[in-house]
From Swiss-Prot:
Family annotation (SUPFAM superfamilies): Nucleic acid-binding proteins
Domain of life: Bacteria
Keyword annotations: DNA replication, DNA-binding, Primosome
Taxonomic lineage: Bacteria, Pseudomonadati, Pseudomonadota, Betaproteobacteria, Nitrosomonadales
Annotated gene: priB
Protein name per UniProt: Replication restart protein PriB
């Protein structure tokens, strides 16, 4: 088991800021407590420098938003270019697949 780090420690950081296009936006679903959940994919494309070489980066990944953030994603809609702030976690407790949990988003 991974030790639980001190919340003030830099080892506890898990923050992602990334831009992309919302794709595959599923119909919203709801938790038993009535919170909206929005699941979608974010398609990212950029140019990045690595070891002095320009690289074209293109990929898609799964993201999930809950409550007010989910409502915002649903309003923004599929095909929109956004900047997302969030953290990475396992898709569920039985999976090792990673997903971005969205804390905030804005249209760009």
């Amino acid at each position: 088991m991974i030790p639980n780090p001190d919340p003030e420690s830099s080892i506890n950081r898990n923050q992602v800021i990334i831009s992309g296009t919302i794709t595959d936006l599923a119909s919203p679903r709801y938790t038993p407590a009535g919170l909206m959940i929005a699941e979608f994919k974010l398609s990212h494309c950029s140019n990045q420098q690595e070891a002095g070489i320009q690289r074209r980066i293109e990929f898609e990944f799964e993201a999930i938003a809950i409550a007010e953030t989910a409502e915002k994603i649903i309003r923004i809609g599929s095909g929109s270019n956004v900047e997302i702030t969030g953290f990475i976690a396992k898709k569920n407790r039985l999976s090792n697949q990673l997903v971005l949990h969205v804390r905030d988003t804005r249209i760009i």
